[in-house]
Curated annotation (Swiss-Prot):
Residues 1192-1210 are annotated as: Required for binding to tRNA. It is found in: Cytoplasm; Nucleus. The lineage of its organism: Eukaryota, Metazoa, Chordata, Craniata, Vertebrata. Phosphorylated. Keywords: Cytoplasm, Nucleus, Phosphoprotein, tRNA processing. The keyword tRNA processing applies. One of its GO terms (cellular component) is cytoplasm. The modification Phosphoserine is found at residues 805, 1172, 1175. Its main location: cytoplasm. Disruption phenotype: Conditional knockout in male germ cells results in defects in wobble uridine tRNA modification and defects in synapsis and meiotic recombination which result in increased apoptosis and complete arrest of gametogenesis, leading to male infertility. Conditional knockout in female germ cells results in female subfertility with reduced litter size although ovaries are morphologically and histologically indistinguishable from those of controls. This is Elongator complex protein 1.
Length: 1333
């Protein structure tokens, strides 16, 4: 749905050269045009508007002096820096334009009709006046000569046995002669020049020749290959014209055919068979086709037509029409009228070989015209909700308009079409009223159509599709307000209009009665911006006039003009890339440079064919896209792979070469953020990016809606709802409390309904009643309930593109479901509890702890509803609905838990349960005593606490059963609450509880339980087992044990305490209860409690122990500390040095283990969006129970593997991590010795072991200093990020770069995260003894 829009026009008028122009060619590298006349060659530079070279062919005798000579072909030879010229007299001349030397490289005595070079300029083909073809090499050596008329069909002649042909078919009463009709050939057309026409395929492997057959006098097309072998001959086509053009892509050969009532452009295949056609918009014998030309990329077919003389026609015209094809329909996109007499008569036209949409035209009055077009989509501005998202497509004198807000129909169909008297060249939409449009036709008239409330249909507006017959049209179509002619006010402009068929370009509708347009000066590189203002007249209501109210001259060629519909800013782009701001609303009509935020004038590095003005982060910027897919924002190139873009509702939408569509919010964006996102340096989120079909382009975006219309290369349309547009629109609706619109959109597009609450929980909970009233559907509210989950989808599934400045309060207790269910239930009960009965039941079921008992009670209450109440729900309906939400067995069990057998029977009857299964069970229960009955029910339902409560009320005769239940289900704590402490049942339960704790090796709680119930012997046994010496000695005192038994008990307790490395407590027990202070001193020395040992020595006056035990123990401890420090220091230095080596190797070889890391990296992003339909809650619910055992086993294996993978073996994959762990352990072990070292330093100094004390203090200080200096080197920020920093550079590979980015995405495991943090060392710890310094 694209049109051709005039990009720029370059005109060189009144070229000063001799003779009359006959043909021309382009010199692409030099940027000049070489024109041939009956006098010679003239090279002109159209940009500088000067004649560069004149070469006379008359002086050398190649052309006659009387002016009767003719040049039939000119070709620029790129590799020879020369030009090849062929004359009608038969000479082939090579001319060096630098030296102006002429050389005749060959001559044909009979004369030359056509000269045609192959596209690769390796072969030259000449058609002679004797109806022969001569093929030559680029060095002008003759390869072969063949007759142009051939009797043979060619090498591609069809072989058939006749089955299915007309000759083998039954022809009824007409007889067999009808199988062989005699087809009389038609003569060539009267206006046929009868000359051969040659065209080459784009790759130069084949060429086609159209000639008039001598025998039949009708035209035929023959196809030859590069070896000059005839391949095929076309089928007989009556009325075949002389024009011939082979599509460069190689698929079709275009020609023309006169039919009885029309004139067609027909297409032939290489085998000579017809393959498609389209009809020209002219009557029979109205025009003739002089030439057909395909552009370089085969996207546009140019047709040069000329009016045939008629008796009643005084002025004849010629036309250049540009046709394109899409969805198998041919569109006339541009029509350029020229005259057939005077200076404006066309001599020849050529497509540019480099720029596909550039057309060169040469006229007889030495006037040269060069026009550049570019592809554009003419769509409405989309600045309001009333904009219908109109897109206009030009098709000759029709404008096909599609209203995408209401209908999506594929081209060439449309919503409605506008009928214009002349072919249309440009369509524009109003900048302030997007549904109004204006049409500029080939006669430079502007037809203005406006959307209003007129009831009468306009005759120039026709509905598409069924045409409205028998249907009510909900669409308001526009009506023709007036057709305006443009009045420039002087004859000079009118004369220029005769020469330049495209006088006006970039027509822009800025106000209701004001248009802007661009024209170009034919004498200098200047452009003129015209203000076209409506002249009000009461004479003619249908025909109006536009006057040029003012004009502004701009130095430079304008190649772009766009107006922002919101800010009314108008940007002008010049050919050199400079962007200007045109202050068209200012009284002075000034033009000033467009400046960025830094005050620097904006200049595009490359000319942009599409330009828009948008506000990005509060700054008005110019966006541009080149024909080479380079995308600019102001003067910054932000991407080089953009195929199309659009700006709508503060969003920027782009499609890329990687077949994605990305959407960015411009309100809070910045230029750097957009550049980073579009360059691919940051991974795009799921909301921004969407995969699209290959080659998709943006057609339009429906304003304030979610629809994005894309067009595929073959022409069909696709409507997508981009996630970013959808979420943005939903957020707007939720902010406006338009819950119904948001809900319908989310339901249709499968957006998780949790977003309704999570977008703003506080606002939603305050407006729950509004939500219920707007939805007003039990089914939809139930759907909302079923999708609720505790997850905050604004943090997981749909994070906002811009972080909110005000954080919305969440639910810290994680009871989101309960809050919503309670609020919704209260609102529904207040509005209409009978209507929303099923939804109220759902609110109870969906709570974190389903309230099934309450649900069943509410169902039971429904029995009182009136049967004729239309809004009420019956018990049967409610139960059937509940069975959809809850498992039937679970519902049956909960109904049984209410102890109401009527409710149980009601649930069972609605389920699929067999009465033989539940009736005997229920009958048995009914016969039991109430408490025992409820105990049986609770036990059946595994509600053992309730069952115990009911059983305890059954009496002492059931205590044995009760005690067994307590033991089986470990209900000791609950049972102790049910009996009085002085009861025998309490004692029995306590004894059983204590025995249970002893079996579980929980000795201290068991001792407390035994002590509480008076079982002192068992309590002493328990306290003794756990080493609780205070409690054990207390119990011993209560048992009134003798001193000897207490001493023995004390020794036993001391042994237990020593095993637990509690030497000080063991010494206290021996000293106070066994009176064995010598053994107590030895235990204190063993536990390094030096000062406490000395206290006991002096307390009991046993100074001799100092020499025998204390001093040797102190010296031995000092020696052990020295050995430990030496070992730890050596280990620390070894690991530190190895870590440096490992890090150096990693920097040198970043690709180590890359393949393993990539293979186990994050999952690939190659799945389609529709593959994630099943929600996470559904999958977790399906597999959580069955896989619990597997999960436990796999987690155990993972922990085991986690321990094994951190190996200190050199070369292991995670050696660096293992070294960090080992170094951290060494530092922590040394740090823990500070208090112990200070204690031993004091006693060493006390007993005059000063040298040993100084040695230990120096060694410990040296070790600590070594570690303090090394910690910043080992645990550096760069070292922490080295594993996640992308590895780039000349030594990197594809795998290494991929792995580094995969590591960026992967979080550090929780087990490894602490390794990257340096161990804590307290420099303020006072461990040193100042007396030793």
């Amino acid at each position: 749905m694209r049109n051709l829009k005039l990009h720029r026009t370059l005109e060189f008028r009144d070229i000063q050269a001799p003779g009359k122009p006959q043909c021309f060619c382009l010199r692409a590298e030099q940027g000049t045009v070489l024109i041939g006349s009956e006098r010679g060659l003239t090279e002109v530079d159209p940009v500088r508007r000067e004649v560069k070279t004149e070469i006379s062919l008359v002086a050398e005798g190649f052309l006659p002096e009387d002016g009767s000579g003719c040049i039939v072909g000119i070709q620029d030879l790129l590799d020879q820096e020369s030009v090849c010229v062929a004359t009608a007299s038969g000479d082939v001349i090579v001319c060096n334009l630098s030296t102006q030397q002429l050389e005749c490289v060959g001559s044909v005595a009979s004369g030359i009709s056509v000269m045609s070079w192959s596209p690769d300029q390796e072969l030259l083909l000449l058609a002679t006046a004797q109806q022969t073809l001569i093929m030559m090499t680029k060095d002008f050596e003759v390869i072969a000569e063949e007759q142009i008329h051939q009797d043979d069909f060619g090498e591609g002649k069809f072989v058939t046995v006749g089955w299915g042909s007309k000759q083998t078919q039954f022809h009824g009463s007409e007889g067999r002669p009808t199988a062989f009709p005699v087809q009389l050939p038609e003569n060539a057309l009267p206006w046929d020049d009868r000359r051969p026409h040659i065209t080459w395929r784009g790759d130069g492997q084949y060429f086609a020749v159209s000639v008039v057959c001598r025998q039949t006098e009708a035209r035929k097309i023959r196809v030859w290959n590069r070896e000059f072998a005839l391949q095929s001959t076309s089928e007989s086509v009556p009325g075949l014209g002389p024009a011939l053009a082979w599509k460069p892509s190689g698929s079709l050969i275009a020609s023309t055919q006169d039919k009885p009532n029309q004139q067609d452009v027909v297409f032939f295949e290489k085998n000579g068979l017809l393959h498609g056609h389209f009809t020209l918009p002219f009557l029979k014998d109205e025009v003739k086709v002089n030439d057909l030309l395909w552009n370089a990329d085969s996207s546009v077919l140019a047709i040069w037509l000329e009016d045939l003389p008629k008796e009643d026609s005084s002025t004849l015209k010629s036309y250049v029409q540009l046709w394109t094809v899409g969805n198998y329909h041919w569109y006339l996109k541009q029509s350029l009228p020229f005259s057939t007499t005077g200076k404006n008569q066309i001599v020849s036209l050529l497509w540019d070989p480099v720029t596909p949409c550039r057309l060169h035209v040469l006229c007889t009055g030495w006037r040269y015209l060069c026009c550049d077009w570019h592809w554009t989509t003419d769509r409405s501005s989309g600045n309001s909700a009333n904009d219908l998202a109109n897109v206009a497509v030009i098709d000759g004198n029709r404008v096909l308009v599609t209203v995408f807000r209401q209908t999506v129909v594929p081209p060439p169909m449309c919503t409605y079409r506008l009928l214009i008297p002349h072919p249309v060249n440009q369509v524009i939409f109003s900048a302030h009223l997007g549904n109004d449009l204006a049409v500029l036709d080939a006669s430079n008239q502007i037809s203005v159509y406006k959307c209003g409330d007129k009831p009468n249909m306009d005759s120039t507006v026709k509905l598409g599709a069924v045409g409205g017959n028998g249907f009510k049209v909900p669409l308001t179509t526009p009506h023709l307000e007036k057709r305006y002619s443009i009045q420039f006010g002087n004859n000079e402009e009118e004369e220029e209009e005769e020469v330049n068929a495209l006088q006006l370009s970039f027509l822009t509708w800025v106000e209701d009665d004001t248009f802007l347009a661009i024209s170009y000066s034919h004498s200098s590189s200047q452009s003129i911006i015209h203000h076209l203002t409506v002249t009000h007249s009461e004479v003619d209501e249908e025909q109006g006039q536009l006057d040029v109210s003012s004009s502004v001259t701009v130095d430079g060629v304008v190649i772009g003009l766009c107006c922002c519909s919101k800010t009314k800013s108008l940007a002008v782009q010049l050919a050199d890339g400079q962007v200007l701001k045109y202050l068209w609303e200012s009284p002075s009509l000034a033009v000033e440079p467009w400046k960025n935020s830094e005050g620097i004038p904006v200049r595009f590095v490359h000319p942009c064919t599409q330009m828009e003005v948008a506000t990005i982060g509060g700054e008005e910027c110019v966006l541009g896209l080149t024909d080479r897919c380079r995308f600019f924002i102001n003067d910054t190139e932000v991407a080089s792979n953009i195929t199309s873009f659009a700006v709508c509702d503060d969003f920027l939408l782009v499609t890329t070469h990687s077949h994605t569509c990305q959407v960015f919010s411009l309100s809070g964006a910045s230029l750097k953020m957009l550049q980073a996102a579009l360059s691919g340096s940051h991974e795009a989120s799921g909301e921004i990016l969407r995969k699209v079909e290959r080659g998709s382009r943006i057609v339009t975006v429906v304003p304030q809606d979610t629809k994005l219309i894309l067009q595929m290369p073959r022409g069909n349309l696709e409507v997508v709802h981009h996630r970013a547009l959808v979420l943005a629109q939903i957020r707007k609706w939720l902010d406006k409390l338009m819950f119904k619109e948001a809900f319908e959109c989310m339901r249709k597009l499968r957006i998780n309904l949790n977003l309704i609450h999570d977008h703003n929980p506080k606002v939603f909970l305050e407006n729950v009643e509004t939500f219920v009233k707007q939805i007003d559907s039990v089914n939809h509210i139930n759907l909302f309930f079923t999708e609720l989950r505790e997850e905050d989808v604004t943090k997981t599934m749909y994070p906002p593109p811009i972080t909110k400045s005000v954080q919305v309060s969440t639910h810290p207790d994680g009871k989101k479901l309960d809050l919503i269910c309670d609020a919704m239930r209260a609102a529904m009960e207040a509005i209409n509890p009978r209507k929303f009965c099923l939804s109220i039941l759902t609110s109870h079921v969906k709570k974190t702890t389903p309230e099934l008992e309450i649900v069943l009670q509410k169902v039971q209450e429904l029995q009182g509803n009136l049967p004729f109440d239309p809004e009420s729900v019956s018990v049967e309906e409610a139960l059937k609905y509940l069975l959809l939400l809850v498992d039937v067995n679970e519902l049956f069990n909960h109904s049984l838990g209410t102890y109401d057998f009527n409710l149980v029977l009601m649930v069972a009857e609605k389920s699929q349960k067999d009465p033989k299964e539940y009736l005997p069970f229920l009958n048995t229960l009914k016969k039991m005593e109430t408490n025992y009955q409820r105990f049986t029910i609770d036990k059946y339902l595994k509600r053992y606490e309730k069952a115990l409560g009911h059983l305890s009320k059954c009496g002492p005769e059931y205590f044995t059963e009760c005690l067994n239940l307590i033991k089986d289900k470990n209900l000791y704590k609950e049972a102790l609450k049910l009996y009085r402490p002085d009861s025998p049942q309490y004692q029995a339960v306590s004894m059983a509880y204590g025995e249970h704790l002893m079996q579980e090796h929980l000795y201290e709680p068991a001792g407390l339980v035994f002590a509480r119930c008076g079982a002192q012997e068992k309590a002493l046994e328990a306290f003794l087992a756990c080493g609780s010496w205070q409690q054990a000695l207390c119990v011993a005192a209560q048992l009134q044990m003798s001193k000897d038994k207490v001493a023995g008990l004390a020794r036993t307790l001391a042994g237990k305490l020593v095993e637990q490395r509690k030497h000080s407590e063991a010494a206290t027990v021996l000293e106070q209860y066994a009176q064995d202070y010598e053994e107590a001193v030895l235990l204190l020395l063993e536990g390094s409690a030096w000062e406490e040992a000395l206290r006991l020595v002096y307390k009991y006056d046993r100074v001799d122990i100092i020499e025998t035990s204390v001093k040797p123990s102190i010296l031995e401890a000092q020696k052990n500390y020295m050995d430990f420090l030496d070992s730890e220091t050596a280990t620390f230095i070894r690991h530190k040095n190895r870590l440096q080596v490992v890090r150096a190797l990693r920097r040198q070889a970043p690709q180590v283990h890359v393949d393993h890391e990539v293979a186990h990296g994050p999952e690939s992003d190659l799945f389609s969006e529709t593959s994630s339909i099943m929600s996470g809650s559904e999958m977790s619910g399906r597999y959580s129970h069955s896989n619990s055992r597997i999960s436990a086993r796999s987690s155990k294996n993972r922990r085991k593997a986690e321990r094994k993978k951190h190996s200190l073996k050199e070369g292991s994959p995670l050696e660096g991590l293992a070294l960090l762990e080992a170094l951290s352990e060494v530092v922590q072990s040394v740090e823990k010795l500070k208090d112990e070292v200070r204690a031993i330093l004091k006693v060493l100094f006390l007993f005059e072991f000063e040298e040993q004390a100084k040695e230990l203090q120096r060694a410990f200080e040296s070790t600590l200093q070594l570690m303090e200096r090394a910690v910043p080197e080992i645990w550096t920020p760069a070292g922490q990020q080295s594993s996640t920093t992308p590895v780039l550079g000349p030594s990197s590979t594809a795998n290494s770069i991929t792995a580094s980015y995969q590591q960026q995405k992967t979080c550090v495991p929780a087990l490894d995260a602490g390794v990257y943090m340096p161990p804590k060392m307290d420099p303020r710890s006072q461990w040193k003894l100042s007396l030793l310094e």
